[in-house]
Regions:
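Long, compositionally biased charged/polar accessory segments in the mid-to-C-terminal portions
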Residues: 47-50, 153-309
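Short, flexible loop segments at boundaries between secondary-structure elements
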Residues: 127-148, 426, 430
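Cysteine-centered iron-sulfur cluster-binding motifs in ferredoxin-type domains/subunits
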Residues: 1-5, 35, 110, 201-208
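Glycine-rich phosphate-binding "P-loop"
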Residues: 63-91, 426-435
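N-terminal, charge-rich interaction modules
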Residues: 18-53
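Aromatic- and Gly/Pro-rich donor/ligand-binding loops
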Residues: 310-448
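A short beta-strand/loop micro-motif in the catalytic core of glycosyltransferases
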Residues: 453-456
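Iron-sulfur cluster-binding cysteine motifs and their immediate structural context
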Residues: 1-14, 218-219
Length: 456
């Protein structure tokens, strides 16, 4: 059944028709964007059909449920930025389909593909709608956020994309049972801060093969972000939906319902190019976030992973193609990790005469998690930003203080670019020689730098 493993035939159009639509203001006020979902749902319910979409459950997890009345549509409206549990809903939908009921299924493209894979047959009474999905965070993320921020037992409702300030992407209201309300925006809310930089993105969502054209559903719907760049009159700040009509069956339906929209304009397909496409990468510290989430609070996990904050910054020539360098630095990294320190590995800048390598050339695969290795700096000047990443700076072993190697290694081993308020530590660093080739001025400068170390 898994659509990732069993790709079903997709004969949707490679050049779908694209429309910018607005339902009446009352519907749009209750909707995340332009009200396209409500118009499509009403079309099916008025024919005694059923609608299946995502709704909040009692524990503030999201489940796909089936509704049969217009009065139940509010359960399915508005975006829910968390993965929906499908559970047994495909099985239930098949029963409705085989009874001849008209069925509308709305979900992420992968969920639409999953339904089609499960059914293994084309039903004329099935209408599928895939959403423009950025990505869906794990329920674990939402659960921990709500529990730590409010206590789940205190929450009455969670509503994303409230529109009383306009059509904005990052508004969420958390209403508590004591009637208090917290308005969450990206500037004041840890969940929003992590979501919008793709900190929670699953690896499988990065190269989603279901997000491209031809799409999975008969229709594709979502926010028509940036439509004003092409057609300013199609954004009145109350919400505009982008609808893709992906096949002839969908076109026949759309011609029936388009008169129910307050505004319905066909636009060029290029207008929706800013919507989700394959190849969108997760935040580089995604795995670091999930590690921190297991160790501590949600808020700290977001702040530290988003901003690249670590317990220790370890500088050294650990990418040098030398068994001693690579093994001793890995050993030091592992010991620190075993002591429950989160360590960021930093190498020489690219401007060093003896520049760093990409990765660890003598290991078949890098032994470090991707989040533990900082991308190479272009110059020493750029490395000043490391002061924002930790309060402890550690220089490791090898002849890093050898005078004849100081300049070839980029002149960074004495941490003179690190603020004196930070803790500086040298572990097994050496001069590598019994004699010193430097001038008296070099001796004095090196002495000053070494005196700023807290421990050697």
């Amino acid at each position: 059944v898994c659509p990732q493993l069993n790709t079903s035939l997709n004969d949707n159009w490679k050049d779908p028709e694209c429309y910018a639509v607005m339902a009446d203001d009352d519907i749009r006020t209750k909707s995340s964007s332009g009200g396209a979902f409500t118009i499509l749902s009403n079309y099916v319910l008025e024919q005694n059909g059923v609608v299946c979409g995502a709704a909040w459950g009692e524990e503030f997890e999201v489940h796909h449920i089936i509704v049969t009345k217009k009065s139940e549509l509010p359960l399915l409206r508005r975006s829910k930025y968390v993965q929906s549990r499908i559970e047994y809903v495909y099985r239930e939908l098949k029963k409705y389909l085989e009874c001849g009921k008209k069925v509308l299924f709305v979900g992420c493209p992968c969920q639409v593909a999953g339904l089609k894979s499960y059914l293994k047959a084309k039903y004329q009474n099935l209408i599928t709608v895939d959403l423009y999905c950025n990505y869906t965070p794990s329920p674990v993320v939402m659960r921990k956020y709500l529990e730590e921020s409010y206590g789940k037992e205190n929450i009455d409702s969670v509503e994303f994309r409230i529109k009383d300030e306009g059509w904005i992407a990052d508004i969420c209201d958390v209403k508590l049972k004591n009637r208090a309300k917290k308005r969450c925006r990206e500037f004041n809310d840890s969940f929003q801060q992590g979501y919008h930089v793709r900190l929670y993105m699953r690896k499988v969502c990065e190269d989603c093969k279901f997000a491209d054209i031809p799409r999975q559903g008969d229709f594709s719907i979502g926010d028509f972000w940036w439509i004003e760049q092409y057609h300013p009159e199609l954004n009145d700040q109350k919400g505009t939906s982008c609808i893709l009509v992906n096949n002839q069956e969908a076109k026949d339906i759309f011609e029936t319902i388009e008169s129910q929209f307050k505004v319905c304009e066909r636009v060029e397909l290029k207008c929706m190019e800013n919507n989700r496409k394959p190849g969108v990468k997760a935040h580089r510290n995604r795995d670091y976030f999930y590690k921190l989430l297991q160790e501590g609070s949600f808020k700290d996990a977001v702040e530290k992973s988003k901003n690249g904050i670590y317990d220790i910054v370890l500088w050294g020539n650990w990418s040098e193609k030398n068994y001693g360098s690579e093994l001793t630095y890995y050993a030091l990294y592992q010991v620190l990790s075993d002591l429950n320190y989160n360590v960021l590995m930093v190498e020489r800048p690219k401007t060093a005469v003896w520049g760093p390598n990409e990765g660890t050339p003598l290991f078949q695969t890098t032994p470090y998690p991707s989040y533990a290795c900082h991308e190479l700096y272009k110059s020493k000047d750029e490395m000043i930003e490391l002061n924002e990443k930790s309060d402890i700076f550690l220089v490791g072993s090898d002849q890093i203080w050898h005078h004849d190697l100081y300049k070839p290694f980029g002149e960074v081993c004495y941490f003179d670019y690190i603020y004196n308020s930070k803790k500086k530590i040298a572990y097994a660093a050496s001069f590598g020689r019994e004699y010193w080739n430097g001038t008296e001025e070099d001796v004095q400068e090196t002495t000053r730098d070494l005196q700023k170390f807290d421990f050697i």
